[in-house]
Amino acid sequence: MTARRVLNPVQRVAIFGGTHGNELSGVFLVNHWLKHGEEIARPGIEVRPFITNPGAVEKCVRYVDTDLNRVFDSENLRNENNLNLSYEVKRAQYINSIFGPKGSEDAYDVILDLHNTTSHMGATLILEDSKDDFTIQMFNYIKTSMAPLACSVLLIEHPRLKYATTRSIAKHPIGVEVGPQPQGVLRADVLDKMRRIIKHALDFINYFNDGKEFLPCILEVFKVLDNVAYPRNANGDCTAIIHNNLQDQDWKELKPGDPMFLTLDGRMIAYEGDCIVYPTFINEAAYYEKNQAFTTTQKMTLCAQAIRCTEPK
């Protein structure tokens, strides 16, 4: 007999835009849905669009004091020293009070957090838990619905890299990352891909609540391995740029010996790892301040059990 998980119906969904204030697809879509909610309405489900970082949105910057998408850990969410808290930590506590508390039964069922990247990643879904059958099933549905358009899945489960994302307060946190799009700019093709992803995600939830059983599935994902830094000299100055052979090659294999960086005097720096990796977030503008040239991933397959709703509508 096929193993099956019987899960509670999804009652509350949030759609976050503006976690980074200069990633405009999510900002524009959420502001549109705040005025025209019929597009995202689904029977029996509360769907709430929400601008997470209005201070950054107003200034069209990534953040005001610190990255909102990295402060949703227990230390920041419980910090009561109001006089010294950054703007984003205060926002995190406020958001947690509305959509959380994180890790509790009162937290929202699903949060869809909308992001743009300057990297050539296309449509990307971000998974936080490799054992979350509900989200894996949703991603499989979205990928199938988006075909033939590619829709990659990035798994950010990692023993050392702790993300503490804005969406992590939900029972099922979902990142939506679409690019390439410059910061502070809107592109119609990028916005359309993001809009379609949200439609398919909400449709999946609606079908699930209606009693549709989703059979066991497998999902190809790219699991985060490490972040690769730019070469720097003793003074901390960047001494090389992304090699042209690597530029815009997100999700494609990088083999040992392949060109990785190019110095300004024309010297090629090769990838010296011991296995094939799949880079992503290549030359992401927002990560220059983090000295992060790209992220390496490994390709793997996840399996999800069949799921159905305990109390179909």
Curated annotation (Swiss-Prot):
Major enzyme class: hydrolase
Cofactor section: Zn(2+)
Residues where Zn(2+) binds: H20, E23, H115
Enzyme Commission code: 3.5.1.15
UniProt GO cellular component terms: cytoplasm; nucleus
Catalytic residues, chain numbering: E177
Coiled-coil region list: none
CDD domains given in the database record: M14_ASPA
Gene3D superfamilies (UniProt xref): 2.20.25.160, Zn peptidases (3.40.630.10)
UniProt keyword terms in alphabetical order: Cytoplasm, Hydrolase, Metal-binding, Nucleus, Zinc
Any one GO MF annotation of this record: metal ion binding
Catalysed transformations (reactions): an N-acyl-L-aspartate + H2O = a carboxylate + L-aspartate
Functional summary from the UniProt entry: Catalyzes the deacetylation of N-acetylaspartic acid (NAA) to produce acetate and L-aspartate.
NCBIfam families in the record: PRK02259.1
Protein name: Aspartoacylase
Organism: Xenopus tropicalis (Western clawed frog)
Gene name in the database record: aspa
